[in-house]
Amino acid sequence: MLNFGLQPSPTGLEFSHYRILAEQDPNLALAGLRMEVETMLKNLSKGFNVSLEERDSAGIITRKLKEKGAITSQQTELVSAVIQLCNAAIHGTKVLSYQAQEILDIAEILRDEYVSWLSWGFQDN
């Protein structure tokens, strides 16, 4: 993965760490999850040759991936839902454990689709 210039996942794509953390500190768990999701988005961008600016937000990266056809409308909606709650948590909105767990459920779907993409290799553009 690193041979292709992809960034490693902070947890090796193992989200159980965030589930455990969400029981004690849901906001911190979602802050970590936000970094995971952004890493996945940037790696997808690299694999699909989507041009990014250094300061592109996760939302902008998601839009660019959708425009390129790299992700579906449903994936776009799921990513947006995850990022929205993660950002709220980072900016001080109190998140309850069950809310964090629900977002982790969605994030695991996205992670599984990302892992499938990794197993296919990069699209030739």
Task: Indicate where each model-derived feature is located.
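Polyanionic, low-complexity intrinsically disordered segments
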Residues: 3, 8-16, 74-77, 116-125
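Alpha-helix N-cap/helix-start motif at coil-to-helix transitions, marked by capping-box chemistry
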Residues: 9, 31, 35, 73-83
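Charge-enriched, short contiguous segments at helix-coil
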Residues: 77-125
